[in-house]
């Protein structure tokens, strides 16, 4: 399903965001860059379109895009997307991705939230609240099964 955005809640409450379709990723980045007065070259947009998900504040995006995928995925490089009441950048990403998908694919964007519901419930609840404030009330919750 290309009309899908995945919000991952990782250990420590870090939040990562990804959109399946590369063309929607580019349009989402363009909308975010307008909102936050950032600029990205065509090469940076292309590199961003290859990233399945990311988890940094918008002011660190340029630096993240420049890294190789190996360096990008090293422990501690991505600190998570801010999603608290003081700096709720996740709300901006959700809105931008919804608008981008509507523009590019003329369809509604579907959402999935990934995480360990038992351990990450407070953070997952914050993500659900962020979606519901934008009238996104239908989403998939994907939780991992752990062996005993």
For the regions a language model picked out, list residue spans one by one.
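Long, low-hydrophobicity, acidic/polar, solvent-exposed interaction domains
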Residues: 1-148
């Amino acid at each position: 399903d290309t009309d899908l955005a995945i919000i991952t809640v990782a250990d420590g409450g870090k939040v990562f965001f990804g959109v399946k379709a590369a063309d929607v990723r580019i349009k989402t980045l363009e909308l975010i860059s307008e909102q936050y007065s950032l600029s990205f070259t065509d090469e940076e947009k292309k590199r961003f379109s290859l990233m399945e998900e990311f988890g940094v504040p918008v002011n660190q995006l340029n630096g993240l895009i420049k890294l190789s995928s190996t360096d990008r995925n090293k422990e501690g490089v991505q600190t998570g997307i801010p999603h608290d009441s003081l700096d709720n950048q996740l709300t901006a990403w959700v809105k931008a991705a919804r608008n981008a998908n509507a523009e590019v694919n003329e369809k509604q964007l579907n959402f999935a939230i990934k995480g360990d519901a038992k351990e990450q419930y407070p953070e997952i609840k914050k993500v659900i609240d962020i979606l519901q404030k934008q009238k996104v009330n239908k989403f998939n919750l994907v939780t991992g099964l752990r062996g005993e």
